[in-house]
Amino acid sequence: MKNIQTLFQTLNITPQNLTLYKQALTHSSYSNEQNPPQEDNERLEFLGDAIVGLLMADYLYSQSKEDEGIMTKKRAQAVCERSLTIYAHNIELQNYLLLGKGEKNKDFNAKSIIADTFEALFGAIYLDLGYLTAKKVFHNIVLPHLAKTIYIIDFKTQLQEIVQSEKKTIQYKIVQEQGPAHSKNFVAEVYLEKNLLGTGEGSTKKAAEQKAAQQALSKVAKPKDLLNNKGGKEKELQ
């Protein structure tokens, strides 16, 4: 196990309650081998899971105007076990873990253990230094790696980039809105001049527009075929 002070330097924090961090790094397999047993990181993991999810939601909400569905998918990808393991390895968190002999003999770098410890660490930071410090640490060690963990396809942006490359414009139109206020369904159409390129449905206007753009892109073998009227049909845009 590396000196925990090195971890604090990496995180750029000055802890007030060292016990919290030692607990965050203590796996239950190690705790159970001690006499008397030490407190493990499972409770901090429970708290940290909520903190990490909140920090990612906070970031996504503040940085974009995307609809709830897209942000939910992005958050799920950014804080899944695979993603948390990537962030943890970048600060070499696996080198600070206290594991029991049995776990060491199995797989010291088990993703689930490392991801859980990452969450426990943020639980400790939050309890010790507060939300704003946890947010600062999160931004420093997570945001640089989001490109590796978030892979939502933004079909509207793809379509817009294709059209803008030829100095043309597209328009979206909501043509149908059904259902009660708490369970709406929208139908959107996307046009290039008078050509209808695609139609899509969704629970929000933006989601329907995404589906319309996706359909437009799926109709052609090559993206630029859209500009040559190979993917659309003429329809008067009202």
UniProtKB/Swiss-Prot annotation:
**DRBM domain: which residues?**
154-222
Alphabetical list of SMART domains matching this protein: DSRM, RIBOc
Q: Does the keyword Isomerase apply?
A: no
- Give the CC-aspect GO terms: cytoplasm
Basic and acidic residues bias spans:
222-238
The UniProt keyword set, sorted, is: Cytoplasm, Endonuclease, Hydrolase, Magnesium, Metal-binding, mRNA processing, Nuclease, RNA-binding, rRNA processing, rRNA-binding, tRNA processing
Q: Where is the RNase III domain?
A: 4-130
Answer whether the UniProt record assigns the keyword tRNA processing to this protein: yes
InterPro entries from the UniProt entry = dsRBD_dom, RNase_III, RNase_III_dom, RNase_III_sf
Q: Which GO terms describe its molecular function?
A: double-stranded RNA binding; metal ion binding; ribonuclease III activity; rRNA binding
Quote the Gene3D superfamilies the UniProt record gives.
3.30.160.20, Ribonuclease III domain
Active site, per annotation: 49, 119
What this protein needs as a cofactor is:
Mg(2+)
Which cellular compartments is it found in?
Cytoplasm
Q: Name one GO biological process term.
A: rRNA processing
Pfam families of this UniProt entry? dsrm (PF00035), Ribonucleas_3_3 (PF14622)
What EC number(s) are associated with this protein in UniProt? 3.1.26.3
- Report residue spans for region: Disordered: 215-238
Subunit field text: Homodimer.
Q: What does this protein do?
A: Digests double-stranded RNA. Involved in the processing of primary rRNA transcript to yield the immediate precursors to the large and small rRNAs (23S and 16S). Processes some mRNAs, and tRNAs when they are encoded in the rRNA operon. Processes pre-crRNA and tracrRNA of type II CRISPR loci if present in the organism.
Kindly give the HAMAP family that the UniProt entry links to this protein. RNase_III
Family according to the record: Belongs to the ribonuclease III family.
From the Swiss-Prot or TrEMBL record, give the protein name. Answer: Ribonuclease 3
This chain's source organism reads Onion yellows phytoplasma (strain OY-M)
Q: Which gene encodes it?
A: rnc
